[in-house]
Regions:
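Glycine-centered tight beta-turn/hairpin loop motif at sheet-sheet or coil-to-beta transitions
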Residues: 67, 178-182
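Membrane-proximal interfacial segments on either side of biological membranes
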Residues: 1-173, 186-282
């Protein structure tokens, strides 16, 4: 936490030998909060929270995260076996203005997405920390001119659900977009955030299992190769991976790929690193 903090503290010190009670209130005004595991900073954090010993309870707080407004509140509790933290988040963000996506992708997006989330953190007194996150939103007001299957008009509902379960070493991120797209991934926490393995399954009704080895598997619907090549030529892959490491073994499967006035059916493309560079097989 960076910046000036105003606080009031009241100590109740019994003279009969009972435990001291510390109560008070803390006021934040345009502070910055650095989140180390994400290498990200909440800016302009403002609001109040009160405490009674180790139990904290905040009022609604406001902040700016990824250049977007954020509403947040939290509470903590000293449980019998663990210190527990609960956080509620919500916002209405414009994906094209987060500063995270490549310029070529930003140009193809417009609109905003309203979302809310809950974070639960368990800090056992005699074991390692665990946490869970659930985010829900709807891309109904987002318009995308990206190639299919990422194209969508504004006004078309596309509910998104994301869940995270993890500890200090790794976490699994899963979820779905609409009724027929599911994804599953495992991330490792170390010097850098590392995607160990992931899978995206289109036209699926259930969560797919993780790949058996490190890598990314993309099971996609029919694709227009020319549109995707044009997007990559505009730099759609630039700046991706700046804050994280990604596997070099990638498998793409599609029932149909059109490219150069040609059409390939039931295609599987595998890209993997070699001593001399990258080997791509189809």
């Amino acid at each position: 936490l960076d910046g000036d903090v105003n606080a009031r503290l009241h100590l109740d010190i019994p003279l009969n030998g009972e435990l001291v009670t510390a109560k008070g209130e803390v006021t934040l005004r345009n502070n910055s909060l650095f989140i180390k595991p994400l290498d990200s900073t909440l800016k302009n954090l403002s609001g109040k929270f009160s405490f009674i010993n180790g139990d904290l309870q905040s009022e609604p707080l406001t902040a700016s995260w990824f250049n977007q407004p954020l509403n947040v509140d939290f509470s903590t509790k000293e449980g019998a076996k663990a210190y527990q933290v609960a956080v509620n988040l919500n916002g209405n963000w414009q994906p094209a203005k987060t500063g995270v996506l490549p310029a070529a992708v930003n140009e193809a997006l417009s609109g905003s997405v309203a979302w809310d989330g809950k974070v639960g953190i368990e800090l056992p007194y005699h074991a390692g920390a665990t946490y869970n996150v659930e985010l829900n939103g709807d891309l109904k007001n987002v318009s995308s001119h990206l190639p299919s299957p990422l194209a969508k008009p504004a006004g078309e509902p596309l509910p998104v659900n994301v869940k995270v379960d993890g500890n200090l070493n790794s976490f699994e991120l899963t979820g779905q977009a609409g009724a027929d797209n599911h994804f599953n991934s495992r991330w490792l926490l170390g010097q850098n955030l590392t995607l160990d393995r992931a899978i995206w399954a289109a036209d699926s009704k259930t969560l797919p299992p993780l790949p058996e080895q490190s890598g990314v598997e993309l099971n996609m619907p029919p694709m227009n190769g020319a549109e995707w090549l044009a997007l990559f030529q505009k730099g759609a892959a630039e700046s991706v991976g700046g804050a994280a490491s990604f596997p070099q073994h990638i498998t793409l499967r599609t029932p149909m790929l059109s490219l150069g006035n040609q059409q390939w059916n039931n295609l599987s493309i595998v890209s993997q690193p070699t001593a001399n560079g990258t080997l791509v097989e189809a």
